Amino acid sequence: MKGRWVKYLLMGTVVAMLAACSSKPTDRGQQYKDGKFTQPFSLVNQPDAVGAPINAGDFAEQINHIRNSSPRLYGNQSNVYNAVQEWLRAGGDTRNMRQFGIDAWQMEGADNYGNVQFTGYYTPVIQARHTRQGEFQYPIYRMPPKRGRLPSRAEIYAGALSDKYILAYSNSLMDNFIMDVQGSGYIDFGDGSPLNFFSYAGKNGHAYRSIGKVLIDRGEVKKEDMSMQAIRHWGETHSEAEVRELLEQNPSFVFFKPQSFAPVKGASAVPLVGRASVASDRSIIPPGTTLLAEVPLLDNNGKFNGQYELRLMVALDVGGAIKGQHFDIYQGIGPEAGHRAGWYNHYGRVWVLKTAPGAGNVFSG
């Protein structure tokens, strides 16, 4: 996964800096039917959302992972988990939540009109080889000893680290960078062996700089068009030297630790289920919190199609770019998940689910 603290997520960092809106555009899923909120969380009689959550099975799987991997976290939240699952077994109608002892606290959103930001992240699968050969020329490194300041990305690309720290060679410098930014990935050595999981091992200590912002500042990509796909397309249409120069603008560099097999885990040390878990700002959304989210649906070009789906998700991860009323939805593993993650910089409504009555302080775990 992205490691416990590394989440300088490509999209979280790229899209978090995209322009805040002074008007009320709706092309990214914003809604304004609930009026203005005056506090971060507002207790509502029932979520004003049509339909039932579409991912009851995935939510149940995520709760099982919490129960098995973190008994303490499960114990802190078991009343909510049990109530929500009983509600789901009865059909999951939002009009009936109170009958199951569930309170819904609507989040105010970044604009105070209930529009909560969604971005996405995923776990890539990287093609690689154990030795440098053919197209496989781009090293993936393990953590070197920290003897003073470690080299910058540009210095590492120039050969500043010994070959003894190389774990594998991939066929794409951009793929390496994306795994670096996501904080982990699966490695396919192409020999029929099971995928290896390369987990986050550390970073070089240099400041992170968004290459998406660099492209925008240079006039290479319009702000409104910025996405992971836009960055990939730019890389595919420019020379290797130009791609390297762009990536070197981000001096931060991540190192990895190979594992024969490991499930993707978040900062809460719980395996993550795609689109049933999120990264959150722990200062307002504690680990294990259950969320009912109205997630905007996107077409194949990443455009909001005017519809939403209700999903239940659990806050199990963190991210350096995830602050305030903003969630990063874990999309899963591989290219399809990456495609979904790459488009998300949209808005929807979110309700924090707690056990009634009132649930006391909604900020407490």
From Swiss-Prot:
Catalytic activity: Exolytic cleavage of the (1->4)-beta-glycosidic linkage between N-acetylmuramic acid (MurNAc) and N-acetylglucosamine (GlcNAc) residues in peptidoglycan, from either the reducing or the non-reducing ends of the peptidoglycan chains, with concomitant formation of a 1,6-anhydrobond in the MurNAc residue
Keyword list, A-Z: Cell outer membrane, Cell wall biogenesis/degradation, Lipoprotein, Lyase, Membrane, Palmitate, Signal
Subcellular location per the Swiss-Prot or TrEMBL entry: Cell outer membrane
Signal peptide residue numbers: 1-20
Entry's Gene Ontology molecular function annotations: hydrolase activity, hydrolyzing O-glycosyl compounds; peptidoglycan lytic transglycosylase activity
Record flagged with keyword rRNA processing: no
Covalently lipidated residues, kind S-diacylglycerol cysteine: 21
Disulphide bond pairs: none
pH dependence: Optimum pH is 4.0-4.5.
EC number: 4.2.2.n1
Membrane topology classification: Lipid-anchor
Domain of life: Bacteria
InterPro entries recorded: 3D_dom, MltA, MltA_B, RlpA-like_sf
Gene Ontology biological process terms in this record: cell wall organization; peptidoglycan catabolic process; peptidoglycan metabolic process; peptidoglycan turnover
Matches recorded under Gene3D superfamilies: Barwin-like endoglucanases (2.40.240.50), RlpA-like domain (2.40.40.10)
CDD domains with a match to the protein in the record: DPBB_MltA-like (cd22785), mltA_B_like (cd14472)
Residues bearing a lipid moiety (N-palmitoyl cysteine): 21
Temperature-related behavior of activity: Loses rapidly its activity at temperatures above 30 degrees Celsius.
Gene Ontology CC: one annotated term: outer membrane-bounded periplasmic space
Pfam families for this protein: 3D, MltA
Subunit record text: Forms a trimeric complex with MrcB/PonB and MipA in vitro.
Role this protein plays: Murein-degrading enzyme. May play a role in recycling of muropeptides during cell elongation and/or cell division. Degrades murein glycan strands and insoluble, high-molecular weight murein sacculi.
Protein name: Membrane-bound lytic murein transglycosylase A
Organism: Escherichia coli (strain K12)
